[in-house]
Amino acid sequence: MSQEVFMPGATTLGLVCKDGVILASERRVSYGYFVMSKSGKKVFKITDTIGAACAGLVADMQILMREVSAYIRIYNYETRRDAGVKSTAKLMASLLFQRRMFPYLTQTIVAGVDSSGPSLYVLDPLGSVLDDKYASVGTGSEIAIGVLESEYKDDMSIEEAKKVVADAFKSAVARDVGSGEGADLLIMTKDGIKEESLKFA
């Protein structure tokens, strides 16, 4: 008797803009062909200017975010300074690598704004860290990345980037059964994080 392996679906993406960073993930939580939830949250605030967005098992995402947030709070308390985006991504990479024999089944994008400006890092389940200007992870990423590559510009404003995010999600949701139900956005600037939502037509 064959046993089918089900992987959770998702589309998650991030873009660096001239005045900040946007992280976004759609809300559908699916497992194989079954939609478990239509309101799953896959974007997470880590600090006042740093966030993360994930694709994969929601339980793994949640525990990883709790762990990272706790370590960052300890770091901020002990050093009396805020952790940067790169150091937050490296901390998360270290936690992922520690679990490489039994990895968290999640692909993660960490982004935010610090003294170096806006930045974005992509992490795989084993802790590899890649910095980029835009990224997409999850089952719908192959579709979304095509839109990002054709529409992304280095000097985009937040408002222009929101339109690119909407276009990428519309394309991904039209073809990927694991993605849908609208999206949650984290918009990060030097002034803080704003949360918004996006509805698909």
Locate each region found by the language model.
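Long, low-complexity N-terminal extensions
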Residues: M1-A201
